[in-house]
C-alpha cells in the first residue's frame, strides 16, 4: 500500500548521514529499507560508474560509497516521497545473479566497501571466501578460477588457492562420510 514502508522510522523529520550508514556494521542506526536518493547533478557527474568489458551493470553502491568516503552526506527524510512497484524481471528479482554475471564490478564494490569501512583482516577473509564460493560454484558460463577471484576481489592469490584446496578436501570428506 502507498502508506506502508519497509523503512525503520526515526523521530526526526530528516537525518543527514553518510551513505556508508546503509551498512549495519557502520552505524548503530543504519539507513534501511527502500529510500529514494537524489543527488546534485554536478556531484553525480563527478563520480562516474566504472566500466568493465563484458559487464553491463554495476551496483550504484560503488559510487555512493565513494561519495561517502570523500565526506559527502545525504539528507534522508523520514517520509514517503515515492511509490514503487517491484517488477518480476527487475533488479531486486534478479538477486545475486546480477553480481555473479558481473564479477569485476561485484569484486570492486566489495573490495572498496571493505577498504572504506576499515574492515579487519578476518572480516576481509570471510568476504573473500564468500566471493570465491559464489563465483566458483555458479553456472559454468560465469564461473571464475581462483586467480580471477583473487584479482577481482583484491585478495592474495595464495588465499584463493588455499580456499580451492580446502573446498576440494571438504567435498572429498563428505563423499567418504556418506559411504
Describe every region a protein language model picked out.
Residues 62, 74-179:
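C-terminal subregions of glycosyltransferases and related glycan-biosynthesis enzymes
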Residues 4-93:
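Conserved nucleotide-sugar donor-binding catalytic segment
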Residues 1:
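Conserved phosphate/oxyanion-binding catalytic-loop motifs
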Amino acid at each position: 500500500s502507498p502508506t506502508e514502508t519497509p523503512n525503520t522510522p526515526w523521530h526526526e523529520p530528516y537525518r543527514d548521514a553518510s551513505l556508508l550508514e546503509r551498512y549495519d556494521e557502520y552505524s548503530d542506526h543504519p539507513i534501511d529499507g527502500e529510500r529514494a536518493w537524489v543527488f546534485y547533478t554536478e556531484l553525480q557527474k563527478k563520480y562516474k560508474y566504472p566500466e568493465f568489458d563484458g559487464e553491463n551493470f554495476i551496483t550504484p553502491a560503488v559510487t555512493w560509497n565513494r561519495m561517502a568516503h570523500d565526506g559527502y552526506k545525504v539528507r534522508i527524510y523520514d517520509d514517503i516521497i515515492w511509490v514503487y512497484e517491484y517488477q518480476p524481471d527487475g533488479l531486486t528479482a534478479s538477486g545475486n545473479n546480477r553480481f555473479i554475471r558481473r564479477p569485476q564490478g561485484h569484486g570492486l564494490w566489495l573490495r572498496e566497501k571493505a577498504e572504506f569501512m576499515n574492515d579487519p583482516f578476518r572480516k576481509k577473509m570471510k568476504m573473500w571466501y564468500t566471493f570465491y564460493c559464489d563465483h566458483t560454484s555458479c553456472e559454468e558460463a560465469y564461473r571464475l578460477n581462483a586467480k580471477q577471484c583473487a584479482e577481482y576481489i583484491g585478495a592474495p592469490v595464495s588465499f584463493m588457492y588455499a580456499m580451492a584446496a580446502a573446498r576440494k578436501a571438504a567435498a572429498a570428506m563428505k563423499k567418504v562420510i556418506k559411504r
